[in-house]
């Protein structure tokens, strides 16, 4: 069973020039948005909605997702950025410790969810072709597909790692255990990329690799579960009458996605300012509970005042 364990020490992007790097994490976001766009296009065509409304919906969704996710991360998990590196909150650069192009890192799904809801509300105020709930019921299908790739991006970056485990599914996250300065110091290799590669490829540094603990690949657990969240939503939308019940898909999305998040948190390491409450639950779990309750409300109690 140990054959299922593996070491994770990848390149995380492609150097363009200077301090600019194309991060694979950013590529995963692009894939998520483009896939979501195609899913929404298919929905618009199926329901004979004017495609002129699709491009602005895409723009609102991208902006709302990125702003909400970034602000959510800062408020919930990394509040020290407000005083220590304020401009990095809004820009794809970090300035503390030297200028570096990082892409948009540090993005929280709870913040993204809130941002999307607000963004769709603002979009609906300008484009009144359907109700807000109609839009939310369909946008969440795209969002659930995108979540699959975002967690793959987290895995590539060796972030949102799991707790130490003896599970046969465990992974050794080399780049989480050793930061760039540490790996250069430990190996004596000046180029940190070559230093990382040497840890897994050069027997001389086997002791450094052996020191890395085996952890749950929590990102992959989530990504795998989100595949089923998407498939369930898509099936209900396409094949059942529930897909036309106002608020049902939106509510089901909240229940499924945040239930997955709640349980995966048990095998995740705390992030940033994350804390454990008196109930033994962490920040991510406490933030997930209201979303599940709201989802149940929309599934079983909500009655629209008007229908489109």
Where does each model-flagged region fall?
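Hydrophobic, membrane-interfacing alpha helices
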Residues: 1-308
């Amino acid at each position: 069973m140990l054959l299922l364990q593996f070491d994770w020490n990848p390149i995380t992007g492609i150097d363009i020039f200077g301090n600019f790097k194309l991060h694979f994490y950013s590529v995963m976001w692009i894939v998520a948005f483009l896939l979501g766009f195609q899913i929404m296009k298919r929905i618009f065509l199926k329901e004979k909605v004017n495609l002129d409304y699709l491009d602005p919906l895409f723009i609102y969704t991208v902006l709302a997702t990125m702003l909400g996710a970034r602000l959510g991360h800062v408020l919930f998990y990394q509040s020290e950025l407000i005083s220590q590196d304020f401009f990095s909150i809004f820009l794809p650069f970090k300035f503390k410790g030297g200028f570096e192009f990082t892409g948009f890192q540090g993005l929280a799904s709870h913040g993204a969810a809130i941002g999307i809801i607000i963004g769709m509300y603002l979009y609906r105020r300008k484009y009144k072709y359907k109700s807000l709930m109609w839009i939310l019921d369909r946008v969440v299908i795209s969002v659930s597909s995108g979540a699959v790739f975002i967690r793959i991006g987290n895995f590539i970056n060796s972030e949102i790692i799991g707790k130490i485990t003896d599970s046969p599914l465990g992974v050794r996250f080399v780049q989480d255990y050793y930061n760039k300065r540490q790996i250069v110091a430990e190996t004596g290799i000046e180029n940190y990329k070559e230093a990382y590669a040497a840890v897994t490829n050069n027997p001389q540094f086997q002791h450094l690799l052996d020191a890395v603990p085996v952890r749950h690949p929590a990102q992959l657990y989530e990504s795998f579960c989100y595949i089923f969240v998407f498939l369930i939503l898509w099936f209900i939308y396409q094949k059942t009458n529930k897909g036309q019940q106002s608020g049902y898909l939106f509510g089901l999305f909240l229940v499924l996605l945040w239930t997955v998040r709640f349980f995966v948190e048990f095998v995740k390491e705390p992030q940033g300012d994350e804390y454990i409450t008196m109930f033994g639950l962490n920040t991510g779990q406490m933030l997930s509970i209201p979303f599940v309750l709201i989802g149940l409300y929309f599934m079983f109690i909500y009655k629209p005042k008007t229908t489109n």
